[in-house]
Amino acid sequence: MRVNGIVVCRGDASVGPDDRVELDSPAPAAFPAPLRLIHEDEHLLVVDKPPGLLTIATETERERTVYRLLGDWMRARGGRRIFVVHRLDRETSGLLVFAKSVAVKRALQAQFEARMPERVYVARVEGVVTEPEGMLTGYLVEDRTLRIRAARDTRRGKEAITRYRVLERYRGATLLELALVTGRRGQIRAQLAALGHPIVGDRTYGSRRDPLRRVCLHAARLGFVHPSGRRVVFESPPPSSFRRA
């Protein structure tokens, strides 16, 4: 507070009828780094997640997650709660949508369960993919180490379908665009490893190179039906380093 241009910190300071009183508004809460805000409205938030950050808490990491960072930011603004709609692996960067109400969360999750959203990724993989485009199909299971892998016995696995097309070919590597038809956990990473083209930097799935010290997988496009009824599409270009790795 300022009285006649002078900062006053005491709450019991006397003020006369001719004094000029100014109240300083608190600075708005800064959006939490290293996230990037893509879109916000009364119904939802869309953010760009960096690699190395969990979407939600696990038993070993509860503090530094996208959900926690966004929740703290919303509370600092006097806002409402947020609700998780879907997730990205810690190693994957790119687009995530969060709901601002239970009703919106349920509506969006129903779209994901019905395979309605457009979910497109970009990945740099090891080796040269010869076919310009194609479909990755199969079944996935979780092994004893909790890693997702291709199932030999289709009766035990969950169906996984991914469309792909080649964006660029390099010496010993390929840049792919991958569109999810199903949305299984670890789907793209497991399917590309089974194909013999693990994602660059993905040591878990057999990559022998890690030039960027990250898994070269990025959620680049996310489209769905907004609660208003209109279809919306959000985009986040993949890191330029994917073309140089």
For each feature predicted by the language model, list its residue ranges.
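Short glycine- and Lys/Arg-enriched binding-loop motifs that mark or flank ligand-binding interfaces
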Residues: M1, D48, R90, L95, ...
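RNA pseudouridine synthases
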Residues: M1-R149, K158, C216, P237-R244
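Conserved hydrophobic positions within beta-strands
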Residues: L37, V125, R163-V166, I199
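A short alpha-helix capping/helix-coil boundary motif
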Residues: V47, L167-E168
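Short histidine-centered beta-strand/loop micro-motifs
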Residues: I56-T58, Q109, A151-D153, E168, ...
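Conserved beta-strand elements flanking the ATP-binding pocket of the protein kinase catalytic core
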Residues: H86, R165, A179
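Pseudouridine synthases involved in rRNA/tRNA modification
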Residues: R155-I161, E168-R171, L175, V181-A245
